[in-house]
Amino acid sequence: MTDLPKIGKPATNALAIVGIDQIEQLSSVTKSNLAHLHGLGPKAIEILEKSLLELGLSFSLVSPDLPELPFFLIGDLACDNAPKRRIVRDLAMSLYAKGLAYDGSLMVDDVVYRAPYSNLVLIGRDQVVSGAIRLTDISSIEVFQILSHGKEAALHGKIVDKQGTLTYFSMFFVFASHKKDSAVSQIMHYQQT
């Protein structure tokens, strides 16, 4: 493994916050996704790209099943042949990303969303889409793990805002049926700053 090149303290710190301290780790990240990371400018990205090329590596290509997001996303993102993992990943990111157009299509009409840490209960797709916890200043989200089995799924991770504040979160999902393309009927959401 090779240490990161000199890219300036803000850029190095931004990468450290999301757990990147070796140049090889960047081969699993897209260049456009990296640009969303607060503190990492075009000059630093150019230097990182040159360092990757020197090692015979490059930034990752865009994953065709990953939605375009206004923040840096890293972690357990591959959904391979697990459609419910993709649904959970995409729904969680859509609920967090303020300003991201989302129609609620991954949820049933009478979905129930609970956030016990804020005593919030929302019932119905429209209420969840408009009232779920959405953050405006997300710099990055790291998904630690996504699990799915039968009618249930869960994911947990870490959010870093543009001020550097860390928020740990987890979401638990219940699907309407066991079918692979089933919509979500219940969401339980926890987070701690």
Task: Locate predicted features.
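Contiguous, function-dense segments enriched for cysteine-driven chemistry
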Residues: 42, 82-86, 121, 126
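A beta-strand edge to alpha-helix "cap/lid" segment located at domain peripheries
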Residues: 73-76, 129-193
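Compact, charge-rich alpha-helical regulatory domains located at protein termini
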Residues: 1-71
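Short, low-complexity N-terminal intrinsically disordered segments enriched in polar/charged residues
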Residues: 63-97
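A solvent-exposed, acidic/Ser-Thr-rich amphipathic alpha-helical stretch
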Residues: 100-149
